[in-house]
Design a protein with these regions (language model features):
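Terminal alpha-helical anchor/extension segments at protein ends
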Residues: 1-136
């Protein structure tokens, strides 16, 4: 049976979950937090940070997406998952997709463009585990 991971993320939090058992239960294996993803732009700007085309918040969000993608790329190389499901709001989903390594991107089986990172594990299962699998 292939190992499936779920990534439920937004600009301030990313949870990596593994699908286990015949009931397809989710087990959280990693929780990344990016407190800067929720900060106000003024809190991130310093005199040493000149104005650029991207805002400080956008820059921090991009760095966070890259951190998640590096983690996923390393996990793929180690053979920790076979299939990957990405769940994130559209803008952050685009960042994840853009930064994902080519071989890891081939493992993406599904993308859900919703912000579900804040849901508890059992609620999240309702969105990402197929109904047929839950009814077994």
């Amino acid at each position: 049976m292939p190992t499936t991971w779920i990534v439920a993320a937004d600009s301030s939090r990313a949870r990596i979950l593994r699908v286990v058992g015949r009931e397809h239960r989710l087990v959280e294996i990693q929780d990344f937090v990016n407190p800067k993803g929720r900060m106000d732009e003024r809190e991130l700007i310093t005199d040493a940070h000149p104005r650029q085309e991207t805002t400080a918040v956008e820059h921090e969000t991009e760095l966070f997406a890259k951190q998640i993608d590096r983690y996923l790329d390393k996990a793929r190389v180690k053979g920790l998952f076979d299939k990957l499901h990405l769940v994130a709001p559209p803008k952050f989903l685009g960042l994840l997709r853009h930064n994902l390594g080519k071989e890891t991107a081939k493992r993406v089986a599904e993308e859900i463009d919703k912000d579900l990172s804040w849901l508890d594990v059992r609620e999240l299962e309702k969105y990402v585990v197929p109904r047929k699998a839950r009814e077994r």
